[in-house]
């Protein structure tokens, strides 16, 4: 039986991973899974070695204060992956966590194939990372077609797969016409997938909305949030 370890670092990655893996489960029923994941992976029957919330911190200060916990979880994750001995380590987004784990795993056991989903934005910042990534990532799955040229030029194996959440939502659109005014412009607000992000940013975003409404009433503000964060926004 083949084994896949699914490695995520935040709720948005958990959602992306569950969408991709659920499709794989339909075609291949003889694969064993283990993960660092959240509620979405759990819904499709994949257990996590610890709660994803334990590694989702917002901002430099928060990360710094919890650096020993984070490093402990990184080392624990590496140990659990090596013990599970998967054929594939499937890491998703959150490069500061997932790629650090993948690098350590590959160094100890080069036989484990490493596939990373959601390319780190190395063409924007920290371009030097790409040469390092090439040493321990076997294949990168790309969300956006413009990324392919960059990774081709760097001789990194890659495949453009598109964004599954966008594809899935093409036929699953929410009708907001009942609660917005047609003569008003829409401002979309994305507070992030992590609860810590939403809790920190929500007061600032609400102040922004109130400020804008005092200046101009010609706007509708639409929040785009994960299922987990919806109640935080509604109850604020």
Predicted feature locations:
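Charged active-site motifs of nucleotide-sugar-dependent glycosyltransferases
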Residues: 2-4, 181-188, 219-220
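Active-site and donor-binding regions of nucleotide-sugar-utilizing enzymes
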Residues: 3-177, 189-201, 211, 215, ...
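Donor-nucleotide binding loops and adjacent catalytic segments primarily
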Residues: 184, 197-236
């Amino acid at each position: 039986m083949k084994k896949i370890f699914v490695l995520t670092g935040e709720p948005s990655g958990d959602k992306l991973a569950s969408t991709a893996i659920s499709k794989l489960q339909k075609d291949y029923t003889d694969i064993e899974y283990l993960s660092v994941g959240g509620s979405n992976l759990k819904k499709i029957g994949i257990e996590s070695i610890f709660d994803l919330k334990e590694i989702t911190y917002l901002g430099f200060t928060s990360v710094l204060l919890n650096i020993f916990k984070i490093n402990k979880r990184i080392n624990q994750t590496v140990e659990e992956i090596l013990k599970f001995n998967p054929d594939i380590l499937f890491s998703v987004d959150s490069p500061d966590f997932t790629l650090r784990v993948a690098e350590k795993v590959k160094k100890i056991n080069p036989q484990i194939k490493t596939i990373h989903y959601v390319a780190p934005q190395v063409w924007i910042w920290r371009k030097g990372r790409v040469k390092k990534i090439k040493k321990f990532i076997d294949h990168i799955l790309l969300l956006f077609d413009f990324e392919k040229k960059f990774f081709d030029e760097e001789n990194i194996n890659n495949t453009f797969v598109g964004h599954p959440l966008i594809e899935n939502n093409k036929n699953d659109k929410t009708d907001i016409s009942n609660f917005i005014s047609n003569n008003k412009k829409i401002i979309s607000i994305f507070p992030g997938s992590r609860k810590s992000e939403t809790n920190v940013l929500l007061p600032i975003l609400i102040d922004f909305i109130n400020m804008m409404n005092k200046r101009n009433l010609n706007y509708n503000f639409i929040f785009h949030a994960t299922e987990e964060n919806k109640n935080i926004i509604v109850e604020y």
